[in-house]
Amino acid sequence: MVKVWLITGCSSGFGQEIALAALAHGDTVVATARDPTKLKQLAKRGALTEQLDVLDSDDKLTERIEKKTGGIDILVNNAGYILAGGVEECSRSEVEAQFNTNVFGQLNVIRAVLPVMRERRSGVVANMGSIGGWHGSPAAGLYCATKACSTILAESLRQEVAHLNIKVTSIEPGYFRTNFLSSGHKTSATKRIPDLAAGVDGVHAGLEAYDHNQPGDPQKGARLIVEALTGSGRCQGRELPARLSLGSDAYQMVSGHIDRYRTDLESWKDVTTTTDCDA
């Protein structure tokens, strides 16, 4: 059965690759971006294209899509970017912009699409999280915070709409070879604090060196995302998890964090469990 996808942030990177993979799967794709002129290649491949800034409230978007396609089966909340800078270095306006796109933008789109899915009693919502949502990182703390927030929102929504046959997940990619870390996609805090250099400069340099040297293949990742969200191919018969960590590096990172969290939990258990009421 042909599915209708709504994907945000399709001008490049994962958004573009997921759109192409969904088209190759035989589905209908509504690809969106702030600048629709950057969607011409997807349009040539058969995608329907729409202008969408996730910060704006477009109450008519879902209505236009329904008229064109008959509904929306799968939403991929992909639009986002990374703000690089120490927590203290990032200004209020820079932090607000990061949260507006990465968190509130996802909420805007969810609020627009969920009424359609609730009415049909079916649908899939996928927030694009990140492996960064599992841990804080020097020089990327605000980005990591937005991705942790995105994932927790998805986990909460998942429980709220499960009885309506709507599935929700957070896709958490590791490092994939897209333009995400390139100039124009990654922004940096304007302020630099010399006292923090020892804590953040290594990460700044590492992100620059890692650009286009990431281990993940975005085309392979996109194909797996399509299979997971449609329950097809390698994912047939599997229940869509609350968190879908993507990439061999993501597996290693998550495994390591779980082990460290468990160690800390157990090592403090003798004192942290002594705070209950006596009776």
Locations of regions flagged by a protein language model:
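SDR active-site lid
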Residues: 163-239
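Active-site helix of classical SDR
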Residues: 110, 146
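Rossmann-fold cofactor-recognition segment
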Residues: 44-57
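Residue(s) in the substrate-gating loop at a strand-loop-helix junction
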Residues: 130
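Substrate-binding pocket helix/loop in short-chain dehydrogenase/reductase
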Residues: 86-87, 94-96
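N-terminal Rossmann NAD(P)H-binding glycine-rich loop of SDR-like oxidoreductase domains
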Residues: 11, 19
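Active-site loop immediately N-terminal to the catalytic Tyr-X3-Lys motif
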Residues: 88, 135-141
